[in-house]
Amino acid sequence: MKAFLLIFLFVSVSLGCSKDSTSLGEPVEIYLLKDFQLLTNKCQVDPSASSLQFTPTVANGEILEYSSSDYQFKLKATALERIKTLSDRTPFAVTVNKEVIYFGFFKPSFSSSSCDHSITMDLSWGQANRILMRLGYPGVPTGVTIEDERNNPRLLAALQNQGKLR
């Protein structure tokens, strides 16, 4: 009877245990925008007139690491394939626990249009499965200031708690 009770207890505890991703900290995700407006005469999302899509384009589990020195996310191949399908100037938001840290635009390196007032996302052609977050596209013009939240403390803390910060 004792053996049966011990086996039952062991099996119950084993089956009841599951990996809880929330115990690793707040999720970091990248969302496309369902609705948005631009600030007048700027390539910049108006935060007061935007909303996130229901599901993330890049889920927390698809972010493998983030390099704070060169602003690169390393993604699972499936997430990178979704990023590759985005059109030029597709707006996105980097979030922590579904709260927007910053907005930006997908700007592939072959784009002929500029985006002077926002963080931009591009594929990293030099390294596999990485996306770059840059200030402006093709760069920041003289006299333009972009609020740089790429290394926002809350974002870095969430990534650090998950062991994804490099």
Q: Which residue ranges define each predicted feature?
A:
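A structural signal for conserved, well-ordered secondary-structure elements
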Residues: 23-166
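Sec-dependent N-terminal signal peptides
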Residues: 4-13
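Bacterial Sec-dependent N-terminal signal peptides
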Residues: 13-25
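Solvent-exposed, well-ordered amphipathic alpha-helical segments
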Residues: 2, 15, 75-76
